[in-house]
């Protein structure tokens, strides 16, 4: 569930099962069905700031696309090149959060994801110093020990923490090729491999595809589970 418009505003929906609560239709409000939320925003807004104003007047409802397609329980990340927000429709109503991490995964709610980052505030890309005991001559025995304790499992909270850390410390060159390459390395740190996350007998959750967008040039980059080669599509050259 991801899309981007010609102005460089991008939006993605991620699973929020058990927490998403859509509202009933209200007179006098801009009632928007969950399945049309992304195109409703991207067809009218050029920036996060414009979207915030529209969200204040919107009522997100659970109208289904068709009887066989119930409303997907999602929360959303919305970003341009200057700002990023998270949008959640919960029992208390529509919540809009500034997202300084620039990251979103599935459940739990965004505020809880951000709070859990407090557990990792001691982590660093630098080698650690011995604060355990002045009486013990402790030394590092491997590179990367400053990030010892960074989650590596495939749960959404662990993936949120790991990709937030990776994004915060990843270093890229100035060229577009270097930036795109580094982006795919960042998301690759939380790839899901077939067989490691079983959701039913013989069925596994995998990273089907990974994508990013050059907001200034309108170029969409992606690769897939079966093909790691990065493909570039210049949307301004396509018949849309």
Spans of model-derived segments:
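A contiguous strand-loop segment
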Residues: 1-29, 57-58, 62
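Structural recognition of the beta-strand scaffold that forms the well-ordered cores
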Residues: 10-13, 77-79, 86, 212
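Short hydrophobic/aromatic-rich beta-strand segments that constitute the beta-sheet cores
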Residues: 11-13, 96, 220-223
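Short, surface-exposed beta-strand-loop junctions and turns on beta-sheet-rich folds
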Residues: 17-19, 92-95, 102, 226-230
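Proteins synthesized as precursors that undergo proteolytic processing into mature forms
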Residues: 28-64, 176-185
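Aromatic- and glycine-enriched pocket-lining scaffold segments that form the walls
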Residues: 48, 52-89
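C-terminus-biased signal that marks the final domain/tail of proteins
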Residues: 64, 71-72, 81-83, 104-240
């Amino acid at each position: 569930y991801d899309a981007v418009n010609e102005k460089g505003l991008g939006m993605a929906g991620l699973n929020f099962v058990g927490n998403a609560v859509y509202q009933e239709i209200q007179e006098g409000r801009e009632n928007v069905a969950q399945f049309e939320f992304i195109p409703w925003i991207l067809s009218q807004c050029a920036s996060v700031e414009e979207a915030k104003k529209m969200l204040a007047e919107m009522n997100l409802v659970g109208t289904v696309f068709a009887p066989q397609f119930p409303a997907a329980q999602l929360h959303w990340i919305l970003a341009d090149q200057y700002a990023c927000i998270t949008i959640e429709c919960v029992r208390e109503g529509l919540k809009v959060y500034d997202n300084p991490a620039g990251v979103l995964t599935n459940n739990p709610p965004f505020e809880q994801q951000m709070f859990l980052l407090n557990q990792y505030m001691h982590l660093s890309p630098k080698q650690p110093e011995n604060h355990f005991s002045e009486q013990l001559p402790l030394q590092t025995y491997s590179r990367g020990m400053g990030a010892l304790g960074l989650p590596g499992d495939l749960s959404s909270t662990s993936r949120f923490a790991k990709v937030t850390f990776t994004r915060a410390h990843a270093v890229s060159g100035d060229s577009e090729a270097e930036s795109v390459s580094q982006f795919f390395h960042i998301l690759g740190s939380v790839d899901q491999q077939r067989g490691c996350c079983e959701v039913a007998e013989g069925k596994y959750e995998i990273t089907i595809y990974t994508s990013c967008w050059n907001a200034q040039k309108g170029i969409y980059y992606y690769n897939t589970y079966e093909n790691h080669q990065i493909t570039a599509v210049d949307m301004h050259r396509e018949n849309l």
